[in-house]
Amino acid sequence: MGMKPKMLVLINSSTGLYDFRNELLSELSKSYCIVVSTPDSGKIDLIKKLGCEVIITPIDRRGINPVVDLKLINNYRKIINKEKPDYILTYTIKPNIYGGFLARVKKINYAVNITGLGTTFQKDGLLQSIVTKMYRVAFKKANVVFFENIENKNIIVNKKIVPDSKCCVLNGAGVNLDRYSYLEYPVDCKTTRFLFIGRVMQEKGFDELYTAMQRLVDGGFDCKLDVLGSYEEDYKKKIDSAVEAGWLSYYGYRNDVRPFIEKSHCFVLPSWHEGMANTNLECASSGRPVITSNIHGCKEAVLDGTTGYLCESQNIDSLYECMKKFITLSYQKRKDMGKAGRKHMENFFDKRIIVDSTIKNLK
């Protein structure tokens, strides 16, 4: 048997790659020797266990310092020259731009993944026009550009970054229905436990959630909020005071969120923008109702009124009304919502279907 072709995967977080795409890596490693370049060591041991080689490459994820980025391009160039990959697969903005550009220049087959357009495309401005131009250059010769929702694809096509024929929209990374198996709904009790999983930051809608919770508690509704995820420093005071008031429990980042999903009644993610919110999928797959924003990347996961509720993004009143509506539901109705959510995941978000579809489109 001849040598397997080599695939280079460029990403900005080993944790994100492993948590959401380990099944894809396993499947790809049957046909390719895989080398992963990542800036962090978070989950590299687990990635190596899948049979991949790992190279640590520093990336300033949010900075826009050209000197730092030139260093990244140079590091990528060295890796490509040394590894001589047959295919390059990139995720997230900097790997997409610089990896895509180098693959194009070196005439290597490549595919890019738009896992969300972030704040850059929320408002017109200099940064948006620079990124648009960079995307155009970097994606020009891509074999395929993957998207996690239709709106992101339409933005990229309308800006004439890539033609529609090169685009492939997947339902995010999908959800592993076995790992996130149906969990029995918690026994009927008078306190409603809401759950938030994600980075505690403005763009995840945490401020709206905090205010809505406070309003519910002040209004005499018996509810609590469990928060999982790291927080940005300016939220410390807020979290501490809610913990002290007794309506919020903070657990930090957790590798395994399933025990927290199990004891929750409802998951809430009032995000401002998402590629495809994995946490919505995981909680729905586990049989929990979901309240989330009525935006692309969130709303696909919910059948409004059947598996949860959709609220307006960046709108405290709308979120408050949805949460209040949920609190007043009967135990049976909540349980039925959770079951319907599980069914919706089985029908449209099964990770196996998404992995197969990704591989089929890489050709």
Labelled PLM ranges:
Residues 55-56, 136, 140-182:
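Donor nucleotide-sugar binding/catalytic pocket of nucleotide-sugar-dependent glycosyltransferases
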Residues 318, 325, 332-347, 357-360:
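A short, well-ordered alpha-helix in the C-terminal region of glycosyltransferases
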Residues 44-50, 215, 219, 224-247, ...:
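Short, structured helix-loop element that forms part of the nucleotide-activated donor/catalytic region
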Residues 289-292, 302:
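Short hydrophobic beta-strand element within catalytic cores of glycosyltransferases
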Residues 18-23, 192, 196-215, 317:
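A conserved mid-protein helix/loop that constitutes part of the nucleotide-sugar donor-binding site
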Residues 304-305, 309-316, 325-331:
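Conserved acidic donor-binding segment of nucleotide-sugar-dependent glycosyltransferases
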Residues 253, 272:
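Aromatic "clamp/platform" in nucleotide-sugar-dependent glycosyltransferases that forms part
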Residues 64-68, 157-158, 172-191, 259:
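Acidic anion/phosphate-binding donor-loop and adjacent secondary structure
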